């Protein structure tokens, strides 16, 4: 008995934690929408854009006001 609980309860809790982890990863994946394309030629240093465009737009809007 791991952690002082019965095996069926332990397995249920383990399954619930794994499923919630997968669901959370899916939500984050859909929210950020990563670019999964692989370029033919790797970008040169300083060429790769990694900033969040929505955040950048909000910051520019707040600076204009």
UniProtKB/Swiss-Prot annotation:
Annotated GO CC locations: mitochondrial inner membrane; mitochondrion
Domain of life, per UniProt, equals Eukaryota
Keyword Mitochondrion recorded: yes
User: GO BP, one example?
Assistant: mitochondrial cytochrome c oxidase assembly
The record describes its membrane topology as:
Single-pass type II membrane protein
Q: Which residues lie on this side of the membrane: Mitochondrial intermembrane?
A: 33-65
Sorted alphabetically, the keyword list is: Membrane, Mitochondrion, Mitochondrion inner membrane, Signal-anchor, Transmembrane, Transmembrane helix
Question: Which ranges make up the Mitochondrial matrix topological domains here?
Answer: 1-9
Q: Phenotype when inactivated?
A: A complete loss of mitochondrial respiratory chain complex III resulting in severe growth retardation, lactic acidosis and early death.
Where in or outside the cell is it found? Mitochondrion inner membrane
The principal localisation class reads mitochondrion
Tissue distribution of the protein: Highly expressed in skeletal and cardiac muscle (at protein level).
The record describes the protein's role as:
Required for the assembly and stability of the mitochondrial ubiquinol-cytochrome c reductase complex (complex III (CIII) or cytochrome b-c1 complex), a multisubunit transmembrane complex that is part of the mitochondrial electron transport chain (ETC) which drives oxidative phosphorylation. Mediates early complex III biogenesis. Participates in regulating the levels of electron transport chain proteins, and therefore energy supply, in response to changes in energy demand. Also required for cytochrome c oxidase complex (complex IV) assembly.
Question: What family is it from?
Answer: Belongs to the UQCC6 family.
Identification of the protein by name: Ubiquinol-cytochrome-c reductase complex assembly factor 6
**Name of encoding gene:** uqcc6
